[in-house]
Amino acid sequence: MVAQAEQDLGIKLFAVHRLDSPTSGLLILAKSAVAAKQFTELFTAHKVQKYYLALAKGKPKKKQGWVIGDMAKSRRSMFKLLRTKENPAITQFFSLSVSEGLRLYLLKPHSGKTHQLRVALASLGVPILGDDLYGGMAADRCYLHAYCLHFRYGDEATGWRDYAYRDVPTQGEHFAAEGVIEALVEWFEPNTLAWPAKGD
C-alpha cells in the first residue's frame, strides 16, 4: 500500500500505523521522517482517536459498551479474547440495526492490538461479515472500514491544530444499504458522540 502511494505521488512516504489486510479506509502516511516520528509518538500515546465501521449478522451479546480483555494467539493465525486484563485490548462501541438481522457497529479502539476489532466482535457472537478467519458469513468483502481519524498536530512554533478526517466506505454492496447511509448521518462526527461509560 505504501509503495503504491509512493508511486502514485512520486515522493517518499513513511508508514506510521497499519491496517489489518482485509480492512479498507483511512491510513496516515508521513512525508518526512520528522513527521513520522511525531505521529508515531501520537499513536503510542493514544492521542489519535480512530473510529471504525463494521457490519455483522446476528444478535450481539450486547448492543453497545466495551470489550476488554487480554488477547492470545490461537490457531490458524487467529487470536482469542481472554478473561484476564493484564495488558488488555480495549474497544468501545455502538451499534444500530440497519436491516433484518444485520447491524452496523461503530468501534473505537483504545489500544492497538493485531486483529483487535475482529476478535472483539467475534467475542460478542457476531463475527464481521465476510471475515472468513473468524467465522463471519460469506460476503463480497470483509466489512471492516477505518472510518474516521481525529487528532491534534503541530508544534510550539507553528501552533497546534485539530484535524478530523472521514472516509465513507464505497466498496461493498452492504455498505451501500439505506440503513447504513442513515446511520452514518447520525455518526457523522464520532468524536462528539456520548460514548458508553465503562461498565456498560
Task: Describe every region a protein language model picked out.
Residues 18, 111-113:
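An acidic site on a long C-lobe helix of protein kinase domains
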Residues 57, 96, 108, 152-154:
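A generic structural motif
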Residues 39, 113-121:
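Short beta-strand segments enriched for Tyr within beta-sheet-rich domains
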Residues 1-90, 94-100, 143, 170-176, ...:
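RNA pseudouridine synthases
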Residues 120-200:
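Pseudouridine synthases involved in rRNA/tRNA modification
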Residues 101, 105-108:
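Short histidine-centered loop motifs in beta-beta connectors
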Residues 102, 114-116, 144-146:
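Active-site lining segments that contact anionic ligands and/or coordinate catalytic metals
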